């Protein structure tokens, strides 16, 4: 049976989060009433001339630098000609042969693997978004409505080389790409709102061959899981066709998420079908090196760099670092808390387990979380300084969630400071030994886990306030002096 290799390239459209559109002053706010954010330029009215949004250009350059691209000092815009109801001008302003960025790539790690992988980028180019068709929900009313609010919203299209060989690679590539775009704050990457969209180009070829097979482009992929599922389905379909000796045309398909299959939409157009030519209404762009370097100076620390620093400088486990750097806001929150606590590992544990536990449960962002990083840092500092136990800290955390008080105030008001009085702890330890003879006997016979029952008794009597280290040491000393169980 013939074996085949999968070839995957991805085209990602990311809306740039500018206040206004790429060639006009209309707003770009999502969710506004239909056709309320339009003007003569994005409506394609005669005589309306486009003017490039400088902020969009800067964000495109920022993305190129983040992905290690070469920034073109000479670039221009072209008209991509086609007819569709959501494209009022009859053409889209895009970039053809002189994109703003070339080369570069995306580094990512597949879950469970140690080594990272790298996918090259072909280019990043700027273009305007099209409008949106809204189809009637009533099958008896075959009408479609055009909303041009989105028309003219600035986009960058990030085109990869066909370097991916599995749907897993595509999935983790997209996650890494999204993380970088959000880190540098050029796009909110909200797939539900359409600000991040992906098309997958998929083909197969016999293993060992260096020739590409017939390519299928898959659209309508509204989540990374959909990308993965669509690729898996398409590879299976193309493999079955090849094994049966059948051929097919290069084509565009849609992903049907209900039927979980790809459906042919049209045979694929070639670039000459769009009759690209330079847009005569827009001058060419000649960038100065100083402009590019000015943008570079604003680039924040990227996810991989931050993750490596957390591991190498702060001594965090790789998993912790990956969780904390998945989003820039989470990493910022952790570092702000660490400035107060001074203990990286304890702060990491609290942020990734307790804080993100609440964030995920309530389906909110870290920015919407009610407890500031400074207050969490204060709580962790009390633990690190030995002033409260982990059990007491959980109680304080619950109080932090419903009040504006800081951890130290809560601990003082509720008298939760750890008890370090040797005589008082010794009294409770002696009581624990006397009242837990069965656990003592098990411990003396070699069952170390029995010690937990005795410690639990001490913590219960002290209402969780006894110093755990002192309790453990005192118990070990006292139990060690008892004769072994016969």
UniProtKB/Swiss-Prot annotation:
Record has Nucleotide-binding as a keyword: yes
EC number(s) reported in the record? 6.3.5.-
Could you tell me the keywords of this UniProt record?
ATP-binding, Ligase, Nucleotide-binding, Protein biosynthesis
Query: Gene3D superfamilies of this UniProt entry?
Result: 1.10.10.410, GatB domain, N-terminal subdomain
Q: Which InterPro entries does the UniProt record give?
A: Asn/Gln-tRNA_amidoTrfase_suB/E, Asn/Gln-tRNA_Trfase_suB/E_cat, Asn/Gln_amidotransferase, Asn/Gln_tRNA_amidoTrase-B-like, GatB, GatB_C_1, GatB_Yqey_C_2, Gln-tRNA_amidoTrfase_suB_CS
Q: Name the enzyme group at the top EC level.
A: ligase
What is one Pfam family matched by this protein? GatB_Yqey
- Reaction(s) catalysed (UniProt annotation): L-glutamyl-tRNA(Gln) + L-glutamine + ATP + H2O = L-glutaminyl-tRNA(Gln) + L-glutamate + ADP + phosphate + H(+); L-aspartyl-tRNA(Asn) + L-glutamine + ATP + H2O = L-asparaginyl-tRNA(Asn) + L-glutamate + ADP + phosphate + 2 H(+)
Gene Ontology biological process terms in this record: glutaminyl-tRNAGln biosynthesis via transamidation; translation
The record's GO molecular-function terms, alphabetically, read: asparaginyl-tRNA synthase (glutamine-hydrolyzing) activity; ATP binding; glutaminyl-tRNA synthase (glutamine-hydrolyzing) activity
Biological function: Allows the formation of correctly charged Asn-tRNA(Asn) or Gln-tRNA(Gln) through the transamidation of misacylated Asp-tRNA(Asn) or Glu-tRNA(Gln) in organisms which lack either or both of asparaginyl-tRNA or glutaminyl-tRNA synthetases. The reaction takes place in the presence of glutamine and ATP through an activated phospho-Asp-tRNA(Asn) or phospho-Glu-tRNA(Gln).
Q: State the family named in the UniProt similarity comment for this chain.
A: Belongs to the GatB/GatE family. GatB subfamily.
> What is the annotated quaternary arrangement, including any partners?
Heterotrimer of A, B and C subunits.
**What protein does this entry describe?**
Aspartyl/glutamyl-tRNA(Asn/Gln) amidotransferase subunit B
Q: Which gene encodes it?
A: gatB
